[in-house]
Amino acid sequence: MTREMIVNNILEILKDEFEIAVPDLDDNLTEKYEFDSIDAIALLERIEELIGSPLTQEEKKQAMEIRTINQICDYIEHIIKKR
């Protein structure tokens, strides 16, 4: 999966699931869109669907530090490369 595909998938998820229409890739989701821990859990579930396998507890823990779309995409790229 290319970076562009990851970005497009994440933007689609944010639009469909969280009604975030046209975010900047460096927007802080928590500050700008009031993204909370419940939203983060829902996003992790969608990321698992996107990559086609469950995340480990360690991977989920690492995800809790993510704040921007670029960081989400970096995170997914890292996980895909590891597998």
Predicted regions span which residues?
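Phosphopantetheine-dependent thiolation modules in NRPS/PKS and related acyl-activating systems
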Residues: 2-45, 49-83
